[in-house]
Amino acid sequence: MVAAEENPESFFAAAPPLRDADAVAARLGEFIARNSSAAGAGGGGRRIVCVTSGGTTVPLEQRCVRYIDNFSSGHRGAASTEYFLKAGYAVIFLHRRGSCQPYCRFLPDDSFLKFFDVDAESKVQVAECHAPVVKKAIGDYCKAIEGGYLLKLPFTTIFEYLQLLKMVATSISSAGPLGMFYLAAAVSDFYVPWDSMAKHKIQSGGGPLDMRLSQVPKMLSVLRNQWAPLAFCISFKLETDSDILIQKADMALNKYKMNIVVANLLATYKEEVIIVTDKERSTIRKMNKDEDLEMQIIKILSQNHSKYICGSTNGCVQSPY
């Protein structure tokens, strides 16, 4: 059973407070200030993008044992973060705990212990077969972190995600059109309001479970109109039915005033996406098995962001591509 959609103010008022909110706000403020004062392409501050990645959970109990999850490995967000960094962006990586991370995509999926060997002197070292990949991952990651270009903020629940997104958006708003949102996270459409949620583990002895779900407030329009009105905004539309994909993408473009919608099908999202703007639709396909589709996506988005900055500031900035 589905209840009517809540308004954003009611959602935030009833949500459990974000842990370490003051510390997160301080880190965000420092990150934005440092990169806003840094020289970017064409002068001025560095471009700043918030990449959201992974799926949100919907707890069924306040002391959560059971939850509803959203499908997302976080691979697209992690890969896109790497290419944004290569393009000269500072990246706030808002990610699901345990999802795919930047620079870790090519590490083996096997047990962590398989990365290592113990030599004759009982010293632990990276296994020779994994050494090149691990060395590159560590080097690239450390460069981004130590350079101050990458800030990672984790979430698990829908409550954490939306509170963090609001904090990030209101911080990025100071960057004006140099700010970007790349909203690749799989966000829950329905949830159990905190004040109507069971406090303890739901017991199975009572028979079938009937649960009333509320619609998660649509935050895209709030982000676009209130939190960061000058930022360049990209949302994603994932569907399983090809017949409604473009229709849904067009609706998101018009209803939420997105600059671009990246449309993809569950069956082919790793090989193909459609870039939808108010002027055109462009299909991007993976050229070969060793190429990242995200490389092409970020190239196109960076070029469109440059045009947006030019139109917003009357000071044209060249894309790094």
Curated annotation (Swiss-Prot):
Recorded GO MF terms: phosphopantothenate--cysteine ligase activity
Catalytic activity entry: (R)-4'-phosphopantothenate + L-cysteine + CTP = N-[(R)-4-phosphopantothenoyl]-L-cysteine + CMP + diphosphate + H(+)
Pathways involved: Cofactor biosynthesis; coenzyme A biosynthesis; CoA from (R)-pantothenate: step 2/5
A GO term from the CC aspect: nucleus
InterPro entries in UniProt: CoaB-like_sf, DNA/pantothenate-metab_flavo_C
UniProt xrefs under Pfam families: DFP
GO biological process, one term: coenzyme A biosynthetic process
Keywords from the UniProt entry: Coenzyme A biosynthesis, Ligase
Enzyme Commission code(s) on record: 6.3.2.5
Family to which the UniProt record says this protein belongs: Belongs to the PPC synthetase family.
Assembly, per entry: Homodimer.
Function statement: Catalyzes the first step in the biosynthesis of coenzyme A from vitamin B5, where cysteine is conjugated to 4'-phosphopantothenate to form 4-phosphopantothenoylcysteine.
Record protein name field: Phosphopantothenate--cysteine ligase 1
Protein's organism: Oryza sativa subsp. japonica (Rice)
